[in-house]
Amino acid sequence: MSETEATGVTDDSAPAIETETVSDAMEHTAIGVVESVEGAIEGAEKWVGDLQRTVKESKDTAMRSARSLRENSTSQFRSIQDFIPHALTQYKTYENAFFSKVTDELIYAKEHPAAAIGIGVAASLVLMRGPRRFLFRNTLGRFQSEEAQFLKAEKHVQELNMSVDLMKKESRKLLERTALAEKDMKRGLSELMNSGNDIHRLAKSVHKAECEAADLMDGLRQIPGRDAIKLRAEVASMTSLLRQKRIALNKRIMGMSDLGVSV
């Protein structure tokens, strides 16, 4: 017996078996793909359903919140509307009571001027700082314990020390500024005096030159000719300029004398 006869499989039946095996494998693969697609579709449908449910719940929540907010706003607005007339009534009541009280007091003051004057004087004394402190010390101040009075006095002493320290610092700064200003003033005064002396010497020199120009002018008047006339014109112009400078210098010297600077 041959091997093919022993196994019961002939050469003609082998291709049929292979074809059947391939078809079974393809069928199983197709079934797996279909199942995978169906699972994916079911998952997508579930996700869409959850999304729709979430959107619906969010929408319902938003609508409930808006409805609650509108109801609360409406109730608050109604409460305010109900409170306004009550508040106006209370305001008018207090206003009438205040003005009636003021009117009664004015009428009483008009009918009893002596009492009104006494009350006014007493009120003014109470409002003033000195009498108020005196009254406090002689009335309510007597009921304070010694420890409380000591603590209050100690606090005042500390405040006074702080004020004194502050004034010391301010006075030290002011003294330093004053010393610097005094030094600058002395230096400026010295420079001003030196400038004044220089101006005074310059004024004397200008006056001397003016006198010499006047003498030269007298001498040129005695010389005939056009050249002498030309020189006289130049000397006259020079003399006028020297006179103007001398007047300006004398004014500056007078101004410095008015400031207390000896020149």
Curated annotation (Swiss-Prot):
Disruption phenotype: Long roots in young seedlings and large inflorescences in adult plants. Arrested seedling development in response to glucose. InterPro entries: RGS1-HXK1_interactor, RHIP1. This is RGS1-HXK1-interacting protein 1. Expressed constitutively. GO terms for biological process: cellular response to glucose stimulus; regulation of glucose mediated signaling pathway. GO terms for cellular component: cytosol; mitochondrion. Interacts with RGS1 and HXK1. Keywords: Developmental protein. Proposed as a reliable reference gene for normalization purposes. Required for some glucose-regulated gene expression, being a physical connection between RGS1 and HXK1 in sugar signaling. Prevents roots and inflorecences growth. PANTHER family: RGS1-HXK1-INTERACTING PROTEIN 1. The keyword S-adenosyl-L-methionine does not apply.
